[in-house]
């Protein structure tokens, strides 16, 4: 039987993901990513409505961090055999995460790899940041990423870095708001000092 490009035909009681074509699987995975993003958006909205903006944001940040460290990171690392603790391995995870940077047109990133333990990315497009920019929502942008420490993105990256390597460091030389619409939304760098890997003096 040929691979299924869609599921508009008859119901298959013995359906398996392996029955789908590569194109259909990619489309389904990207749809799952959008569903995960939607779950995150609704979760933070409900938390803020019920607990207030600050407490709700803090609660959601903690829920997301625990979900990544308890489920997403270990399960994806196991599924794709990503076992190293260097920065480039974390970027491999970023590419295939439930809200990953390669799927469905949600993000457009450029990567700069100095070595396996020094990697930067430039965010040319971000669906969430673009939404806040379009609606002039400075508070939403700050809570997402623009205020740096305390924002959702900063909290998430702290948790993900720690899950891969407690010695990993990060900096964020560019954050919103953008000077103009042709500028990147953000730029982040992640690295591990060689002395930290070798156990040498700081």
Residue ranges and their predicted role:
Residues 1-120, 125-152, 156-158, 162-185, ...:
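N-terminal accessory segment detector
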